[in-house]
Amino acid sequence: MQYHSPENFSSAAYIAANAQGSVRFLAGGTDVLVQLRSEMFTPDTLIDIKKADGACCIERSADDGWRIGAAVTGAEMSEHKHLKSDWPGVVEAVDLIGSTQIQGRATLVGNLCNGSPAADSVPALVAADACIVVQSLSGERTMNVMDCLLYTSDAADELRS
């Protein structure tokens, strides 16, 4: 297995696009690390995005919404008083993801991108009309969470955040 820790999402997309075999992204790791340790699945390439620019940030977006980085944990979201005030349903949904220990590692983006039918945060994201940013070699594009759920439009080099 090849391990990469890129400095930005453009580099992560480049690594993913040029990788041979299976690729997995690592942010919180609550699912990926379990799969690795139990030998359920070992990807050919593991891309750790925790150190990518913006991966750990919670900030206001230009449209007065919120931008939540791909590696922001549920615990970090719960502790952010302004986010909690503006998006109470989303923060409450994130609080439903696992135990306190899991919330210290689990990410909102991981909960969405894993594609589990039991993803606790997804209904709240849909209700909040949330959008995601998808990164590829061609650049970034923004799409609504609902479209993300209905269509499998990701190219091989795209990374959702």
Give the location of each predicted region.
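C-terminal structural segment of proteins
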Residues: M1-S153
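Single conserved hydrophobic/aromatic residue that forms the stacking wall/gate
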Residues: Y151-S161
